[in-house]
C-alpha cells in the first residue's frame, strides 16, 4: 500500500470518509457527529492520509492537534480520526501500516501522545490499538458519556 498525504476534502478522502460513516451507521445506527473542520487536518496542525493499492484508495486516517484546555487532552496530543480500511482489503495489514504512519507524522510534527475514540462495536479496531500499545484514558468529546465508547492513548516515541 502506498500512503499519500492528501487534503481532508480530496475526492479520494471524501469517498473513504463516506464509507466509514456508512460503517458507523451499520454498527451503531448513526454516523459520527463529532465536529470536524477540514482545516484541522492540514499541516502543521494535522494531517490526512490515504492509502492506495494499485492506484485505488483503500484506507485512510488522520490526526489533528490538541493542546488543551479540554479535559483529557494534554499539550502535544494528536487526536486520531477516520481510521478506515475498505472491507475487501481488511486483513492485509493496511490498518497497522496506516496507524504507524499517523504516529510517525504526529511525532515528526512535535506531537507527544496519540489519543482516539473508538467503540465496542469495532472489536477489531480495539484489538489493533491495544496490540499497538494504546491504553485506556478518560472519555472526551461528543460521545464521552456513551457506554459503547472506548478511549485510548499512546505516548509517541522515536523508534
Q: Where are the regions that the model predicts?
A:
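Acetyl-CoA-dependent GNAT
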Residues: 1-81, 86-88, 99-101, 105, ...
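Conserved G/P- and acidic residue-centered "switch" motifs that form tight phosphate/ATP-binding loops
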Residues: 55, 93, 110
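Conserved catalytic-core motifs of GNAT/GCN5-like acyltransferases
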Residues: 8, 115-118, 126, 130-151
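Conserved catalytic core of two-component sensor histidine kinases
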Residues: 123
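Active-site acidic-Proline motif in GNAT/NAT acetyltransferases
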Residues: 86-88, 92, 120
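Conserved amphipathic alpha-helical interaction elements at protein-protein interfaces in regulatory
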Residues: 91, 104-108, 135
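Conserved GNAT acetyl-CoA-binding A-motif
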Residues: 99, 106-118
Amino acid at each position: 500500500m502506498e500512503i499519500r498525504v492528501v487534503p481532508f476534502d480530496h475526492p479520494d478522502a471524501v469517498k473513504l470518509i463516506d464509507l466509514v460513516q456508512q460503517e458507523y451507521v451499520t454498527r451503531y445506527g448513526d454516523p459520527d457527529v463529532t465536529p470536524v473542520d477540514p482545516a484541522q487536518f492540514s499541516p502543521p496542525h494535522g494531517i490526512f492520509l490515504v492509502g492506495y493499492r494499485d492506484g485505488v484508495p483503500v484506507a485512510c486516517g488522520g490526526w489533528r492537534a490538541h493542546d488543551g484546555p479540554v479535559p483529557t487532552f494534554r499539550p502535544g496530543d494528536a487526536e486520531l480520526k477516520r481510521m478506515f480500511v475498505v472491507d475487501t482489503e481488511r486483513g492485509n495489514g493496511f490498518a497497522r501500516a496506516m496507524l504507524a504512519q499517523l504516529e510517525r507524522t504526529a511525532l515528526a510534527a512535535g506531537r507527544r501522545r496519540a489519543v482516539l475514540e473508538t467503540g465496542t462495536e469495532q472489536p477489531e479496531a480495539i484489538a489493533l490499538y491495544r496490540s499497538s500499545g494504546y491504553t485506556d484514558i478518560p472519555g472526551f468529546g461528543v460521545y464521552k458519556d456513551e457506554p459503547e465508547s472506548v478511549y485510548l492513548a499512546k505516548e509517541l516515541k522515536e523508534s
